[in-house]
A protein has these predicted regions:
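Short beta->alpha connector loops
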Residues: 9-11, 63-66, 87-89
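A residue-level signal for conserved active-site and pocket-lining positions in enzyme catalytic cores
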Residues: 7, 29, 52, 82, ...
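An anion-binding loop in the catalytic cleft
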Residues: 214-319
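N-terminal glycine-/serine-/threonine-rich beta1-alpha1-beta2 phosphate-ribose binding loop
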Residues: 32, 36-80
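Donor/substrate-binding cores of folate-linked one-carbon enzymes
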Residues: 22, 32, 81-200, 205-207
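Conserved beta-strand segments of alpha/beta enzyme cores
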Residues: 25, 56-58, 102
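Amphipathic, non-transmembrane alpha-helical secondary structure
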Residues: 13, 17-21, 71-75, 177
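N-terminal Rossmann-like dinucleotide-binding module
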Residues: 1-39
Length: 319
């Protein structure tokens, strides 16, 4: 079978690797254009482009999905099926109708839960105990197509979005190959999603990392995990931005204003929240590397009563 693969980030790499090891032929790759990256903002290829170049597979990087200079070479590849993992663009009907066997998508959630661009992060943020991969036939909606296969995995208590995503990516590759095998064998029946159970997982923005200390400690602990590695959960202490990388919840009846440091131990800071204490154990102050609280306290002093704020202090206007 002739397959075109569409994908962009590291999450998509195991899917392409699995296809390359399968009995099918990957005849072309579609990935997003090179983007500025790093401090120098030099143009860098996507992880999928890097893999495609290494395997000497033809590549298309469309700026406009309806442009003839993209659609004509795509059609010339004559794909029987298009496989998509984290491509990052919506496919219009002209593409969806191109391959005789349709377009199959690998999605990082248990659909219809968490449709959208950040399903892994939101599953952790919301404190879910499990998640998984769903393969589906694509339509013009946002992850609304009929489901093909689905497999669950646990979310471990210590998981961050960054540790969970690679496990899901590997599962996605395996499930993609199995989905295609069953489609070719004619033994797979698409199942419509239950719209009443659908939830969304919108793309995270930098400002989503701001810590709202009025939330419960458990919710904040989950947010710290779900926002790692990007954008990171952050707050401001003594006018400086602090990113909190590791934290746990401690049940308590503490009534001090949320965000207040009420105890400093050798290993952690205990901070009040809307319900319970957040035990902070790993941080990254502004212009610093990631540190355990113990490492930070070896050279700095934190005093109970100091308080985290949602933003830096605002200077009063000069008369």
């Amino acid at each position: 079978m002739r397959i075109v693969f569409m994908g962009t980030p590291e999450f998509a790499v195991p899917s392409l690797e699995a296809l390359l090891k399968s009995d099918d032929q990957v005849v072309g790759i579609v990935t997003q254009p090179d983007r500025p990256k790093g401090r120098g903002q030099q143009l860098a290829p996507s992880p999928i482009k890097v893999l495609a170049q290494r395997e000497h597979i033809p590549i298309l990087q469309p700026v406009k999905m309806k442009a003839p200079e993209f659609l004509e070479p795509l059609a010339a590849w004559k794909p029987d099926l298009i496989a998509v993992t984290a491509f990052g663009r919506i496919l219009h009907s002209g593409i969806l109708k191109l391959p005789p066997m349709g377009c199959v998508n690998v999605h990082g959630s248990l659909l219809p839960k968490y449709r959208g661009a950040a399903p892994v992060q939101w599953a952790v943020i919301n404190g879910d105990s499990e998640t998984g991969i769903t393969t589906m036939m694509m339509d013009e909606g946002m992850d609304t197509g009929a489901m093909l296969l689905q497999e669950r995995i646990p979310i471990l208590p210590e998981d961050t979005a960054g540790t969970l995503a690679p496990r899901l990516a590997v599962l996605g590759g395996r499930l993609l190959v199995e989905t295609i095998r069953q489609l070719k064998a004619g033994i797979l029946t698409p199942i419509a999603q239950n719209e009443s159970q659908a939830t969304m997982a919108p793309l995270l923005k930098k400002e989503d990392g701001v810590i709202d200390w009025s939330l419960a400690a458990t919710a904040l602990s989950n947010r710290v995990r779900g926002l790692s590695p990007w954008p990171g959960a952050y707050s401001f202490l003594l006018g400086e931005r602090w990113t909190i990388w590791k934290a746990g919840a401690i049940p308590t009846q503490e009534h001090t204003a949320p965000g207040t440091i009420v105890q400093v131990t050798k290993q952690s800071l205990h901070v009040t929240t809307g319900n319970g204490l957040l035990e902070v154990t790993e941080i990254q102050p502004a212009n610093s590397k990631r540190l355990t609280v113990a490492q930070y306290l070896s050279g700095h002093r934190i005093i109970p009563g100091q308080r985290f704020e949602a933003g830096p202090p605002v200077e009063a206007a000069q008369p």
